[in-house]
Amino acid sequence: TNSTEYIPGIAMSIHAHPDDQEFSVGGTLARWAQAGCEIISVIITSGDSGSNDPAKDGSHKQELAQLREKEQLAANTVLGIRQTVFLRYPDGELEPTIALRKDLTRIIRQFKPDAVLTGNPEAWFYGDEYFNHPDHRAAAQAACEAVFPSAGTRLIFTDLLA
């Protein structure tokens, strides 16, 4: 690695769905992991709506969630990520609620990352070809608000104080 390249000691990746981090920051995470960074992957939703297979109906959601977690753990192994947190919120229904921000604040306070990677909460479109999923925007907004002000302000969520 370049001696001037920033490599955090601990980094946290916070994304809505299994597979989101691979499309957005996977290369950075792999590079950082290879350089010795400890990475915590936080996946907010279960990914249980991530199929348009006409043979699947609501009865398959638990099976799909288990498959998505297995796939995410395998992807994280390839990237060099050894710690994964699944919050298991419903896929396709994510909102940047106080409850979600509190869950993320708890995890940030627990691991104390030097860097947090997430999506852009304001990005509705990427170029001319991709309409950003509302779960991505909600996850990014909640992650940003958990980083600041919540994680660093002791009197926000005092029940999380050690």
Language model: regions and residue ranges:
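Active-site rim/loop-helix segments in enzyme catalytic domains that contact anionic ligands
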Residues: T1-K112
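Metal-dependent de-N-acetylase/amidase catalytic core
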Residues: T1-I14, T97-A162
